[in-house]
Regions:
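Non-catalytic, solvent-exposed segments at the cell envelope interface
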Residues: 1-224
Length: 224
């Protein structure tokens, strides 16, 4: 915590990497499929990809995200681009400007779900989801929220799953209250290509059962 740094890394869900499957067996597949085998499989997959230790997780769905953002009293999301949500993301066509946007829970989820409005598709959606998480962290670490964090947690405790001990959360809150230095939240997105590397064309995808599926091959230098 001495660096006051939070690094948010976006890994495309369609990344074709070595994942942890049933009984700990490893094989190449899309990252999102690791989730079929539980949170631990997803954590192990990302640990192997980045060569780091991952101790904790937070798992939340769309309804939980709405509840968390609303419990915080809304958040500010800094959008890279201006766009309007389509029906796949939200029944309400929310419009977002480039720069700061004040969002309630429903707007934050719509912002995080949209992908058809962008030429970069899911890559931009991943960056938007990171921007939304950054907005949540900035609001959650503000003095106004920290001084009543117990009430906020109680309001959303059944909306997400985590293995972070309550004592650890309490220690982090006390640390932040004693040192009001704002966290330096940085974001980074893994880049890749949808074009198979040499020797991994349509026939290869047919063999692996991924022909016709959306697959991203991450750039090695982007991961490193």
């Amino acid at each position: 915590c001495s660096s006051d740094l939070i690094l948010l890394v976006t890994t495309p869900r369609d990344s074709y990497i070595k994942i942890t499957g049933p009984d700990g067996r490893k094989g190449y597949d899309k990252l999102t499929h690791a989730g079929n085998y539980g949170v631990e499989a997803s954590m192990d997959t990302l640990q192997n990809l980045y060569g780091i230790d991952i101790d904790y997780y937070v798992k939340i769905n769309f309804s939980g995200c709405v509840a968390v953002v609303d419990a915080l009293g809304g958040i500010t999301i800094d959008s890279e681009v201006e766009f309007t949500c389509g029906e796949d993301a939200s029944p309400i066509p929310y419009h977002f400007v480039k720069g700061p946007n004040e969002c309630d829970g429903e707007m934050a989820v719509a912002f995080s779900r949209e992908r058809h409005a962008f030429a970069a598709g899911d890559f931009q959606r991943g960056r938007n989801q990171t921007a939304a998480i950054k907005g949540i962290l900035q609001k959650a670490t503000s003095p106004a929220i920290l001084t009543k964090y117990s009430a906020v947690l109680d309001a959303v405790s059944d909306m997400f799953l985590t293995n972070i001990p309550t004592s650890t959360i309490s220690d982090l809150v006390k640390l932040q209250l004693s040192d009001s230095t704002a966290w330096n939240i940085q974001t980074y997105s893994i880049e890749g290509t949808t074009q198979p590397p040499a020797g991994q064309g349509p026939a290869y995808l047919e063999i692996t059962g991924l022909r016709g599926a959306s697959v991203v091959y991450p750039y090695a230098d982007s991961i490193n």
